[in-house]
């Protein structure tokens, strides 16, 4: 599928020596995770594991971590009250009864709450990870113990990554009819290896900008054969997950990996979309001097009005202390940029894919890689200069730290409703194209989360609703409204 190959996958290429390759895929858990290093050298694919019910329909690092993972999930549920509320409201009618959902997302305590919600609503689920470093091993174990067919562990190799996806899709006697994807790799694999599966698929729900790009490429080429829902560009994803989640998690990820002090540091953020805006706001608040690079004049003007200098990367690359990519594009930071960085410059990515930083160009004999701590590599030039590369250019927050549970509840609720909508839509409502969520659905997701803040909406009077030409119950904004 040529359309997919235009957007390289997040796993990238792994061409280092065996010793470095092993250190790059050690089964480190996230900073909040329980770890058991006794069997780190044994691949989960080589183990024979069963849960307490005797099932072996999973592949995780260590099923014995399930009890700890269950506690992590229960803690997440406390801050995901809206998703739990949706689960309770819809559990009786089972809107996903008969749904067979194959998913490829980050596997964390928060996504586990989503997966178990889908199961409670009647779906059967098979799940793999969309990022080789973001899986919380104990959470994957808890899902496996609960009967979910999950194939994921932290520190997968590239071969492991595709093997896990294949195990989810290719199972005798079970065929998916819905796809929930984050990055497009699952969709790509089905197109490439099992195109006949799409005869049964009712729809695709895609969360990330990378995956959405790939869907639009297919649609433009006339090769998208099922309806797809673009969750990434929904208001509830863009304005909450992308902005507020990144505003908090960028600092967490950088602190945990580098212990950097932000006051007075010069930072360049590539991209001033919602992710970039969140990162910049957090860095500025702690006293960092922040520069922006942008291709879009509207976003660039927003950055200027927010008090940031908009520059070309080449203008500041020699002086900055930190480089952060937030574009969803490829080769934003090239080998030329990396060669010109000053000693100890920190380089990381807050976009979905690992293609934003040209990490492949650093896999050369003249450069030495030194793993100094989990997800932190020093790339050393012949003259002794070091560049600090985080998570091998993959997503910083989920690879190196955690993300705010409440914000992920908003995204997870949106994903659940999108799956329900596509699965239950009458024939003909959605064609073979990419769709945004209906405005009413966005508003419903937001309304479910307001009680957490003890927030109370004002209600329109009949006269006010008539004056504005609105239904008193919404939607309250036209589709063209920009929040």
UniProtKB/Swiss-Prot annotation:
Keywords: Cell membrane, Cytoplasm, Endoplasmic reticulum, Membrane, Microsome, NAD, One-carbon metabolism, Phosphoprotein, RNA-binding. It is found in: Endoplasmic reticulum; Cytoplasm, Cytosol; Apical cell membrane; Microsome. Phosphorylated at Ser/Thr residues between Ser-21 and Thr-25 in the PEST region: required for interaction with dATP-bound RRM1 and ITPR1. Phosphorylation at Ser-21 by PRKD1 and CAMK4 is required for further phosphorylations by CSNK1A1. Phosphorylation is induced by oxidative stress. Probably phosphorylated by CAMK2A; phosphorylation at Ser-21 may be required for interaction with SLC9A3. Dephosphorylated in response to apoptotic stress conditions which causes translocation of both AHCYL1 and BCL2L10 from mitochondria-associated endoplasmic reticulum membranes and promotes apoptosis. Gene3D superfamilies: Adenosylhomocysteinase-like, NAD(P)-binding Rossmann-like Domain. Residues 17-36 have a biased composition (Low complexity). It is a peripheral membrane protein. GO terms for molecular function: enzyme regulator activity; identical protein binding; RNA binding. Binds 1 NAD(+) per subunit. The modification Phosphoserine is found at residues 21, 24, 27, 30, 37, 344. Substrate binds at residues 108, 182, 207, 237, 241. NAD(+) binds at residues 271-275, 294, 329, 350-352. Pfam families: AdoHcyase (PF05221), AdoHcyase_NAD (PF00670). Residues 473-483 are annotated as: PDZ-binding. SMART domains: AdoHcyase (SM00996), AdoHcyase_NAD (SM00997). GO terms for biological process: angiotensin-activated signaling pathway; apoptotic process; epithelial fluid transport; mitochondrion-endoplasmic reticulum membrane tethering; one-carbon metabolic process; positive regulation of sodium ion transport; protein export from nucleus; regulation of monoatomic anion transport. SUPFAM superfamilies: Formate/glycerate dehydrogenase catalytic domain-like, NAD(P)-binding Rossmann-fold domains. Residues 234-401 are annotated as: NAD binding. GO terms for cellular component: apical plasma membrane; cytoplasm; cytosol; endoplasmic reticulum; intracellular membrane-bounded organelle; mitochondria-associated endoplasmic reticulum membrane contact site. Residues 91-154 are annotated as: Interaction with BCL2L10. It comes from the Eukaryota. Multifaceted cellular regulator which coordinates several essential cellular functions including regulation of epithelial HCO3(-) and fluid secretion, mRNA processing and DNA replication. Regulates ITPR1 sensitivity to inositol 1,4,5-trisphosphate, competing for the common binding site and acting as endogenous 'pseudoligand' whose inhibitory activity can be modulated by its phosphorylation status. Promotes the formation of contact points between the endoplasmic reticulum (ER) and mitochondria, facilitating transfer of Ca(2+) from the ER to mitochondria. Forms multimers. Forms heteromultimers with AHCYL2 (via the C-terminal region). Interacts (when phosphorylated) with ITPR1 (when not phosphorylated); the interaction suppresses inositol 1,4,5-trisphosphate binding to ITPR1. Interacts with BCL2L10; this strengthens the interaction of AHCYL1 with ITPR1. Interacts with CFTR and SLC26A6; the interactions take place once AHCYL1 is released from ITPR1 and increase CFTR and SLC26A6 activities. Interacts with RRM1; in a phosphorylation- and (dATP)-dependent manner. Belongs to the adenosylhomocysteinase family. The PEST region is essential for the interaction with ITPR1, and, when phosphorylated, is also the RRM1-binding region. The PDZ-binding region is required for maximal interaction with ITPR1 and is also responsible for the IP3-insensitive interaction with ITPR1. This is S-adenosylhomocysteine hydrolase-like protein 1. It comes from Rattus norvegicus (Rat).
């Amino acid at each position: 599928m040529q359309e997919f190959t235009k957007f390289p996958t997040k796993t990238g290429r792994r061409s280092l020596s065996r010793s470095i390759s092993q250190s790059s895929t050690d089964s480190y858990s996230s900073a909040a995770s329980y770890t058991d290093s006794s069997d780190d050298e044994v691949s989960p694919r080589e183990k024979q594991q069963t849960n307490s019910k005797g099932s072996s329909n999973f592949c995780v690092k260590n099923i014995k971590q399930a009890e700890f993972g269950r506690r992590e999930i229960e803690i997440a549920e406390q801050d995901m009250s809206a998703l739990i509320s949706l689960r309770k409201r819809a559990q009786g009618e089972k809107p996903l009864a008969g749904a067979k959902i194959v998913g490829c997302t980050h596997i964390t305590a928060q996504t586990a709450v989503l997966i178990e919600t889908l199961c409670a609503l009647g779906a059967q689920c098979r799940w793999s990870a969309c990022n080789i470093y973001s899986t919380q091993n104990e959470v994957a174990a808890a899902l496996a113990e609960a009967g979910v067919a999950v194939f994921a562990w932290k520190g997968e190799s590239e071969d492991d990554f595709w093997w896990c996806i294949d195990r989810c899709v290719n199972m005798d006697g079970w065929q998916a009819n819905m796809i929930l994807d984050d990055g497009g790799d699952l969709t790509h694999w089905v197109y490439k290896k099992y195109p006949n599966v799409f005869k049964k698929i009712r729809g695709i729900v895609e969360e990330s900008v990378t995956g959405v790009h790939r869907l639009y490429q297919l649609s433009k080429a006339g090769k998208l054969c099922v309806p797809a829902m673009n969750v990434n560009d929904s208001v509830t994803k863009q304005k909450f997950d992308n902005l507020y989640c990144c505003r908090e998690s960028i600092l967490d990820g950088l602190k945990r990996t580098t212990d950097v002090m932000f006051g007075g540091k010069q930072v360049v953020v590539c991209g001033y979309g919602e992710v970039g805006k969140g990162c910049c706001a957090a860095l500025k608040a702690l006293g960092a001097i922040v520069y922006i690079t942008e291709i879009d004049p509207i976003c660039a003007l927003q950055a200027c009005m927010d008090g940031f200098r908009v520059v070309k990367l080449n203008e500041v690359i020699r002086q900055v202390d930190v480089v952060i990519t937030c574009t969803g594009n490829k080769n934003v930071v090239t080998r030329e940029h990396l060669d010109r960085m000053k000693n100890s410059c920190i380089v990381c990515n807050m976009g979905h894919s690992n293609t934003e930083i040209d990490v492949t160009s650093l896999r050369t004999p003249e450069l030495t890689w030194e793993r100094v701590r989990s997800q932190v590599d020093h790339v050393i030039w012949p003259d002794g200069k070091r560049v600090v590369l985080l998570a091998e250019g993959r997503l910083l927050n989920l690879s190196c730290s955690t993300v705010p549970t409440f914000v992920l509840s908003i995204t997870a609720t949106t994903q659940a409703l999108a799956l329900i909508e596509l699965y239950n839509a009458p024939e003909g409502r959605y064609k073979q194209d990419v769709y945004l969520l209906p405005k009413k659905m966005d508003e419903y997701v937001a309304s479910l989360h307001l009680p957490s803040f003890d927030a109370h909406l004002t209600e329109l009077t009949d006269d006010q609703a008539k004056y504005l030409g609105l239904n008193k119950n919404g939607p309250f904004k036209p589709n063209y409204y920009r929040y």
